[in-house]
Amino acid sequence: MDDIAPGMDWKKFADFKALLDEYGIKPLIGVVPDNQDRNLERTEENGKDGREHMPEDFWEYVKGLQERGWIIAMHGYRHVYTQKKGGVFPLNLFSEFAGLPLAEQLAMLEKGRSVLDSHGIKTDIFMAPAHSYDRNTLKALRQAGFGRITDGFGSKPYLWKQMCFYPISFRLGSSLKKNHGITTMVVHVNTVNRKDMENYRRIFREYETISYGDYLQTEAVKRGWAGHGVEYLLAVGKRILVKFL
């Protein structure tokens, strides 16, 4: 689940959480440490319906989810796109991190981690806003104590640049039809609609599911430059297809 922030659409979050609870699924959630992205501020625009589901203390609520087995990733720092770069996984040509100097990226990561630490939330997993990061991001992540990142394409975790990647699905429909491997899907909780909910319910009902904590126990395989080259081209291709569809 993406874009978890204090002002998100709490009604939609509550509805999706209820669906996850029904099927016993404990997901990974990407938490923005210091959200400055107005697009993620949805509580007020949803009025009373949104505020009724909003917890009194956001950070205590997130910490409680972690204690109950939900996996927390740090989703960027402020979720503000200042760079027109796609980095080494160019699904998008905008970024909070890719294109910035190493020292600046490291400072952002350390500030984000400090926010999480101050609320008792520990994680070494990073989720890049817009899926965009570059080699400096990976260096900065290692220096800041992050060893895992939720991105890339594949059917199992892989090792590259001294980081462990937990890939997303290139094309969910095709991934679900495969009889091997594990696929993950990205849920933008602020934009989930009724049709989406029906589709997620169908997926949970028809396919075998596991919690993200179980996925983290999957043995990672090594990936070299050739594998990364294919992944890069797939990301470019998907970006172009999405643009024209």
Regions found by a protein language model. Give the residues of each.
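Active-site beta->alpha N-cap acidic-glycine motif
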Residues: 1-68, 115
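Alpha-helical scaffolding within the catalytic cores
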Residues: 13-14, 53-62, 154-175
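Generic structural signal for well-ordered alpha-helices
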Residues: 13-17, 59-63, 109-113, 138, ...
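C-terminal domain-boundary segment and adjacent tail
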Residues: 24-31, 149, 191-245
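Hydrophobic faces of well-ordered beta-strands that scaffold small-molecule active sites
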Residues: 27-29, 72-75, 123-126, 148-151, ...
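Short glycine-enriched loops at secondary-structure junctions
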Residues: 33, 76-82
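Short, flexible, mixed-charge acidic loops at enzyme active sites
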Residues: 80-92
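Catalytic domains of cell-wall/extracellular-matrix polysaccharide-remodeling enzymes
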Residues: 96-171, 193-197
